[in-house]
């Protein structure tokens, strides 16, 4: 039973938005804030896809690149965890992707684990591009993350004196994947490690690479209508 959760971004196509049905709503606790969240759902090829609705955070002209991205994605992580009992879904594994979901494991294991509903859940964290890390000032520990300063001071959430969402995702993951076995090796070296190679080397026994998949029907250059000209292996002489 695999289900997906994403923010309800403005950029989602109207054809999908027309299918969305409200499922539940409630309040997310984020540090000192109490914030509304809504959950809408579609069935996409037999898979349930949930959309976290909060227009203040997600009704914008692009997906990310805002001054409050630290707050937006901390909110998203807490909203996902908060909604699970309300939709009656108790996953064995939560698969998180990149820095935007880096706090999922932090919140799960430092806060939500107090509730037996969550205690069996594990985190898989996938790194697509280590360059983008979600780096923020230490002050967000109190103002946004709302967890003890100790988690910064002991290095769990800290890198180079800042809160680092990417590192947080790795520290709290039960297992880490990257986009290839080669990349999994490369990021253990300073040139590719983006200041996180030291931690990555300590965690290498729970890191592996999985090659990105490709839908050969959707991305078939012989039939693809979105490219300037179709072609096959026979188009170009040897």
What is each stretch, according to the model?
Residues 1-238:
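Catalytic cores of nucleotide-sugar-dependent glycosyltransferases that transfer UDP/GDP/TDP-activated
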């Amino acid at each position: 039973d695999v289900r997906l959760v994403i923010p309800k971004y403005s950029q989602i196509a109207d054809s999908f938005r027309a299918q969305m049905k409200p499922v539940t709503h409630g309040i997310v606790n984020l540090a000192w804030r109490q914030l509304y969240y809504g959950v809408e759902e579609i069935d996409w090829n037999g898979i349930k896809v949930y959309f976290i609705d909060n227009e203040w955070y997600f009704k914008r002209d692009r997906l990310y690149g805002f001054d409050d991205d630290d707050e937006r994605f901390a909110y998203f992580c807490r909203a996902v965890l908060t909604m699970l009992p309300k939709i009656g879904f108790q996953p064995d594994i939560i698969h998180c992707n990149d820095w935007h979901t880096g706090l999922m494991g932090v919140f799960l294991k430092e806060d939500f684990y107090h509730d037996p509903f969550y205690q069996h859940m594990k985190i898989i964290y996938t790194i697509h591009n280590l360059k983008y890390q979600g780096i923020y000032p230490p002050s967000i520990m109190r103002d946004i993350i709302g967890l003890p300063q100790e988690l910064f001071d002991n290095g769990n959430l800290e890198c180079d004196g800042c809160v680092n969402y990417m590192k947080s995702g790795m520290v709290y993951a039960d297992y880490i994947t990257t986009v290839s076995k080669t990349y999994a090796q490369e990021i253990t070296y300073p040139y590719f490690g983006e200041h996180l190679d030291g931690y990555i080397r300590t965690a290498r026994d729970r890191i592996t690479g999985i090659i990105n998949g490709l839908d050969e029907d959707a991305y078939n250059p012989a039939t693809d209508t979105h490219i300037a000209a179709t072609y096959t292996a026979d188009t170009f002489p040897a």
